[in-house]
Amino acid sequence: MDKRPNIILLMADQMRGDCLGIAGHPDVKTPFLDALAGEGVRYENAYSACPTCVPARATLYTGMSQEHTGRVGYEDLVPWDYPHTLAGELSKAGYYTQCVGKMHVHPLRNNLGFHDVRLHDGYLHAYRRPATPSYEDQRVADDYYWWLKQQLGVDADPVDTGLDCNSWVVRPWIYEEKYHPTNWVASECRDFLRRRDRSKPFFLMASFVRPHPPLDAPEYYLNLYKDESLAEPWRGDWNDCVRWERDVHSYHAQTAPSDESYIQQLRAGYYAAITHMDHQIGRLVSALVEEQIMDNTIILFVSDHGEMLGDHLMFQKAKPFQGSIRVPLFISGPERYIGKRGTVRTDLAELRDVMPTLLELAGAPIPETVDGTSLLHPVDREYLHGEHTLGEDSMHFILTKEDKYIWYSQTGRELYFNLRDDPHETKNVLEENPERVAELRTLLIDALKNREEGYTDGHTLLVGKTPVTVLQHTEVL
């Protein structure tokens, strides 16, 4: 029997890097994740360089930077055809590879190297349009939707809550908890463990859709937070109040709600979704204990990106600020694989590092296309170039463990934060630090030298160049 370790990738969607109890969050309750993190190695400086679902997942699945995946913004319906993927390489190495939950690739049933996928991508507008072929319609191609209709009737649909997939509105789940997609992911994972081929190691990706909206946790979890005095969002001296006043009444805007009670509801609903997911991860871990395989199983937990959650008058992701780009990341398992348990590392980690880390743990070769570095060793990354195309908010940033420089490509606006002294980005100290800003700006110019958008002439940053969401080379992979 193959003695290599089993590998589980636990993936949250839109979970902030600070939203773990073990990380010192004042409000959110994550007992099962805390237990796993406490028995592992936790990375305090883990980031998503292109912080929305599609580009972030492209990086995680391939180990490539956003420049090399070609995904520099959010764009559905673009084919995924990468020669080397995490699941594909583990499959070639002799692992049985199973995904349960969110993939967010195109076409929907692109297994991306997995032997099997039990799919639930959440609510995706692009796959519910009248022109969508029936086999690509989410209500047919998505396993959770298909299962829910079998259980509750053909009219059953998670959108019956009336909540949008990018809304800050909160409402309890309207069906029994066992029908919630978060429960479904855990249940399907438990069933996989029951029926797996025990003669070979497995790679299981348990990919939860929450705490990405809709914020529809079962009532029990909402009750944990709804009457609590929750910490308020962070505000800064640079916040865009004009933009906030313009957009604030749109329930799916990039801005946070204006009513303080709505902000508290938003945060309560978000934390409830996290705790609900945490408890279902507990269900999954209990199955590992029952199967007596915890002593040869490695668990890596991560999110694709974060959530602003009202900080700096903002909501959602695709922003260059800590709430949006910083993600939780830890590796839990036997010390013979991961090193000393209980360690907290400050290496500058990014989603591209997940693939080489898991391949090394499996004893599999790491393809030359991989840009990331295995987290099993010190990460020698002095800075990170991040970006996201989003209309007038299209931006780039240079991030170090100490500070951050931000440039908005359509307006030329610049921000600089000293993260060592101001981790919540409350003061823009651009004018006070001209030499350091010039150093970081030079790094950004260098990172953008060969970009098709023409963001730089090699000497300065050029404002107003047309941004794209998908670089041209992606179309010919």
What do the PLM-derived regions correspond to, one by one?
Residues 1-408, 414, 423-442, 469-477:
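Formylglycine-dependent sulfatase
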Residues 433-458:
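A contiguous, mid-protein "functional segment" used to position or interact
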Residues 453-472:
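Short, charged, surface-exposed hinge/linker loops at domain edges
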Residues 420:
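Residues forming the ATP-binding cleft of Hanks-type serine/threonine protein kinase domains
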Residues 417:
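Extracellular C-type lectin-like domains
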